[in-house]
Every structure is written in C-alpha cells, then in structure tokens.
C-alpha cells in the first residue's frame, strides 16, 4: 500500500475500500502481540472476547466480562502505535439498555484507549449502534455467526444457508450500516452471501470464514500459527 498513515483511523478504512485495498484484522490480547502485529503493518487489532477461549481456556465467549476486555484492551493500546484498536463489547454489556451500552462503551474508550467497539447483532442492536455513533463512539458491526448467541444458534454453525436466512442477514447488514457502523464483520456465511452483502454496502466488510469477496479478512494468531483452528458446523 502507498501513503500509509502514521496512525490508522476510521476514515482511513473507508478510503482503503475505495482504493480496492485489502484490510487486515488480527485478534490481539496483550502488548507483545500488539507490538509484533503493529510492526508488521496489520491494519486493525481486535481485542476480541475470543480471549475467553484462546487465553482463559473457556468453552465460549459468554463468561468474558467487561473488566477482562478492558484489562486486555489497555495492554494492546499501550503497544499499538499505528493499528486501529477495536474492543469487543462482551455478552450482556450492551443488550439491556442503550444507557448501559453507552456507559460500558465509554469505559473501553476512556480507560482502555480503544478507537472503536464491536457489537454483535443486526436490527436488534441498530438503535444502540445509532446512539453510540451519535455520541462520537465508532462502532464495528458483526452479523452471521455471532458467538455470543451460540446457545440460541445451537453451536458454531454456518449461518444464512438458505434464501430466507440470507435475506434476513442482508436486512441486518443494511440496518447496521444505516445506524452508522463504519465496518461490518461477516462470520461463517456462504461465499455468495458475503459477496452479495459486500456489493450492497458502502462500508467495508471483514470476513471470518466468509469467502474471498469481502473488503478484508480477520484471523487470530492461534489460527495463523496452527495452534487452534476455528471450524463451523454445516448442519
């Protein structure tokens, strides 16, 4: 890439999409990871609630607390000088009320130093996304397989596998974009569905198990190194 900024910010991602440049996002959980990835030129560092499984040995992301994400976000932001740092909002830290979401997101920005937060869900969280962005807090969306809903979904299953489900996912994606999200994670959906969503949206799409026709890709260091694989059930 040419003309790399010293510090990536939300508007730079839109510009990268316009130029047809691929966006690279990796999960990072501590200062060492963040420093290595930052020096390698990774665009976005996601302090994911996946730290529950990767770092803490939990079965799901659901037990991860706001304090845990805050702790790791502080470590990552101390070491990342160029990459955009996005912090996951954990399970039930934004679903009860918009005021709750605002308060919890504010901690990730003020105390953690995050440049953005990520919320799972589509139309159900659109009002929350709108309120956060109106308050000046950048939001990344996340649709498809949403790990915080693993019990309702019946496990880590590929989503949007039939036409009706694909249509519902498209509505969710459009709602999140309309609410002001600056980017959208598409996880565990068929390649064709991800391509269709990417072509409809004006914001960047970041794929996790969603094929190649997306604006960027996300992975974790454990997946890249072969220490841990993330697989999805197809039935």
Regions found by a protein language model. Give the residues of each.
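Alpha/beta enzyme core
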Residues: 2-233
């Amino acid at each position: 890439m040419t003309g790399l900024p010293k510090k990536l910010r939300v508007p730079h991602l839109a510009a990268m999409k316009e130029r047809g440049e691929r966006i690279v996002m990796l999960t990072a959980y501590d200062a060492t990871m963040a420093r290595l990835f930052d020096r390698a030129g990774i665009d976005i560092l996601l302090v994911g609630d996946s730290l529950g499984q990767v770092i803490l040995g939990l079965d799901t992301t659901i037990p991860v607390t706001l304090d845990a994400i805050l702790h790791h976000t502080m470590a990552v932001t101390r070491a990342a000088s160029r990459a955009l740092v996005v912090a996951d909002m954990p399970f039930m830290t934004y679903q009860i009320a918009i005021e709750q979401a605002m308060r919890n997101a504010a901690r990730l920005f003020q105390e953690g130093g995050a440049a953005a937060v990520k919320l799972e869900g589509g139309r159900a969280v659109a009002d929350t996304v709108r309120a956060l962005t109106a308050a000046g807090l950048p939001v990344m969306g996340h649709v498809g397989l949403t790990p915080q809903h693993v019990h309702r979904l019946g496990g880590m299953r590929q989503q949007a596998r039939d036409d009706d489900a694909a249509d519902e996912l498209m509505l969710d994606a459009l709602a999140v974009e309309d609410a002001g999200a600056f980017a959208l994670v598409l996880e565990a959906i068929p390649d064709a569905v991800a391509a269709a969503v990417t072509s409809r949206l004006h914001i960047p799409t970041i794929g996790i198990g969603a094929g190649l026709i997306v604006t960027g890709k996300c992975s974790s260091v454990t997946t890249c190194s072969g220490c841990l694989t993330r697989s999805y059930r197809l039935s």
